[in-house]
Amino acid sequence: MLNSVKKLLGDSQKRKLKKYEQLVQEINNLEEKLSDLSDEELRHKTITFKDMLRDGKTVDDIKVEAFAVVREAAKRVLGLRHYDVQLIGGLVLLEGNIAEMPTGEGKTLVSSLPTYVRALEGKGVHVITVNDYLAKRDKELIGQVHEFLGLKVGLNIPQIDPFEKKLAYEADITYGIGTEFGFDYLRDNMAASKNEQVQRPYHFAIIDEIDSVLIDEAKTPLIIAGKKSSSSDLHYLCAKVIKSFQDTLHYTYDAESKSASFTEDGIIKIEDLFDIDNLYDLEHQTLYHYMIQALRAHVAFQCDVDYIVHDEKILLVDIFTGRVMDGRSLSDGLHQALEAKEGLEITEENQTQASITIQNFFRMYPALSGMTGTAKTEEKEFNRVYNMEVIPIPTNRPIIREDKKDVVYVTADAKYKAVREDVLKHNKQGRPILIGTMSILQSETVARYLDEANITYQLLNAKSAEQEADLIATAGQKGQITIATNMAGRGTDILLGEGVHELGGLHVIGTERHESRRVDNQLKGRAGRQGDPGSSQFFLSLEDEMLKRFAQEEVEKLTKSLKTDETGLILTAKVHDFVNRTQLICEGSHFSMREYNLKLDDVINDQRNVIYKLRNNLLQEDTNMIEIIIPMIDHAVEAISKQYLVEGMLPEEWDFASLTASLNEILSVENMPSLSANNVHSPEDLQSVLKETLSLYKERVNELDSHTDLQQSLRYVALHFLDQNWVNHLDAMTHLKEGIGLRQYQQEDPTRLYQKEALDIFLYTYGNFEKEMCRYVARHLGVPENVQ
């Protein structure tokens, strides 16, 4: 078996393989000895390992025996014994890499090994799944093994209260969905006190279906939003105006990146319709924002693909699963733009209060690893962004699934008719069939074609992951036909029913190539698990979404030279190369987009870290607020100095009256020294003139040090001002990101410009926070005796 691993891993990973071979042999050598131990003696191994780690041993020192202990515990508790290949998978995870294991190879059992070892360090281990159902299932199953060995296991799901969350995070091993861990991080950094925070510092995480979490979901940031009012009339008006706009004349839409922008003619049309001179003027920023969101809603979002309308409401659809995302809405006025587009009542707009991308959240873990059936095609991204290798793990039994060559048709209608014929053929044999689609709309299209032939099927649009899992689990029964979005029910194996093995197993039909080979492979991998028979075939057309978005012109050229049969099937061989090439272009485009967005988010991530570090410092009861405020006084004076003592202007031109008024706001002194062109010729002169005033004022502020009640008051006020400024900052950053793409047309590097302008905005935000704190202290102190 291990020789087959060598071939699979290739030359570059042979050294690792030798190490795995040796370690697996060492683990196997301990099996007989451990099987002789009583349950109590086996359980006591956990205490022994913890003592060894406390005495200076490392995880590497104990991993062989610890893996053997988990294997023995799983045999006793679950009746399951880890295969050698599963031990290899566990070793890969322990090293912080990705174990690529096909469907049905027991990834859940594999995770029991590294989670146990890293949990022994006492710092907590997080096991990330793609939905609540799988988190509960895996916690209940694998949790039995860890609890048998004396560890505490917790579950972190959205429905539980903060007290339960705190308990879940205090457990040795915590199961949950990645987004909930991320939202808890954001909520902790909005907490009014330390007692409200639930998480502890991150240590080690294992992500199941890691490609889904870190790549597919990486496009969507985690956002906590509050409500703010918006103009319904303006939303409706902008939606109406946009309907009269023509593609390429008034706007451009890049289907590849799903980004839209106005052309010069479009800008002129808006200015004429609203009777304004310059849409880009600051006073028209709101109008521009409403118009660009109306344009995005009109061209980038399709009903029954990206969202559905139900009970007079816009419900967003998860593009990866086809499920409705209850309670989720788009931020920054885009949701309201969709409501206006569909003629629905406009709801309150969301204002971002805290946000983080999936990438930057998981990069906070010192150690990260993951499992999936399909990751090798994205290895470059995993390596570059997360510094993880993808290591394929061999199957316990050979894969005998037959993956048939794609068939490509000229039209979508011809394709769906061919799908129907293929369904009839395999259904007559009694074989179960799984038809994978890309969206709810496509699922319904396939269903309509099957209805025309009176074919009975199960349309999988389940409202909960649990129902999905039940339906997917029965998709392997004799004669069963299931239509599902390709990611639906992921994590649940399709077991073959009685007699199906002899008929040839599950037949999988793909109705369109995805924008990633990885997702195609996931669909194929539904069949042929654990050495079962099975087959797969993709039915494509030149009208498919991927080809329309990434190769429309090439399709038009290609069509002229194609040979087809009477059904519309393309017989020209080069069409397959064309499809494969387009898919690679698509993958590269998405990777570039994620990389670009990550570069932009890295900027705000650095800013977020500064704000959250200060915020957590403010939450500490022993933080001396006066020590924080004293430096702010100097910073605020310096900022005001820069504002009014403008470089390049003569001192006689400086506005000393406004300068004095601003200083009085933050210093609260009765007699501010006289400031004019006579005694202030530079910012340094101002510092000299104010030296005694500042010194005496700081002494008065320092006297507040002993006032405990005031310290607490200052803490709450500082948190309030900081949060308020941060929310406004996020709003400003959103608008900056919106407009930065336009700079490409000015021959400027948008990333560099974004970094520069983001820094300016951040310095303004932080400076404003410091000035507000100084004003508050000045008002509290009141006016003292005269300072001459």
From Swiss-Prot:
Q: Which residues bind ATP?
A: 86, 104-108, 493
Classification via Pfam families: P-loop_SecA, SecA_DEAD, SecA_PP_bind, SecA_SW
EC number from the UniProt entry: 7.4.2.8
| Role noted for this protein | Part of the Sec protein translocase complex. Interacts with the SecYEG preprotein conducting channel. Has a central role in coupling the hydrolysis of ATP to the transfer of proteins into and across the cell membrane, serving as an ATP-driven molecular motor driving the stepwise translocation of polypeptide chains across the membrane.
> What gene is this protein translated from?
secA2
Q: What is this enzyme's catalytic activity, as reactions? A: ATP + H2O + cellular proteinSide 1 = ADP + phosphate + cellular proteinSide 2
Q: How does it assemble?
A: Monomer and homodimer. Part of the essential Sec protein translocation apparatus which comprises SecA, SecYEG and auxiliary proteins SecDF. Other proteins may also be involved.
Q: Which GO terms describe its biological process?
A: intracellular protein transmembrane transport; protein import; protein targeting; protein transport by the Sec complex
**Which segment of the chain is annotated as a signal peptide?**
none
Enzyme kind, highest EC tier? translocase
Q: Which GO terms describe its cellular component?
A: cell envelope Sec protein transport complex; cytosol; plasma membrane
How does the entry describe its membrane topology? Peripheral membrane protein
Which Gene Ontology molecular-function terms are recorded?
ATP binding; protein-exporting ATPase activity
Recorded source organism is: Bacillus thuringiensis (strain Al Hakam)
Where does this protein reside within or beyond the cell? Cell membrane; Cytoplasm
- Which HAMAP family does the entry link to? SecA
The record's comment on protein family reads: Belongs to the SecA family.
Task: Indicate whether RNA-binding appears among the record's keywords.
Answer: no
In which broad location class does this protein mainly occur, judging by the first location in its UniProt entry? membrane
- For this UniProt record, give its keywords in alphabetical order, as a comma-separated list: ATP-binding, Cell membrane, Cytoplasm, Membrane, Nucleotide-binding, Protein transport, Translocase, Translocation, Transport
What's this protein's name?
A: Protein translocase subunit SecA 2
Q: Key word Lyase present in the record? A: no
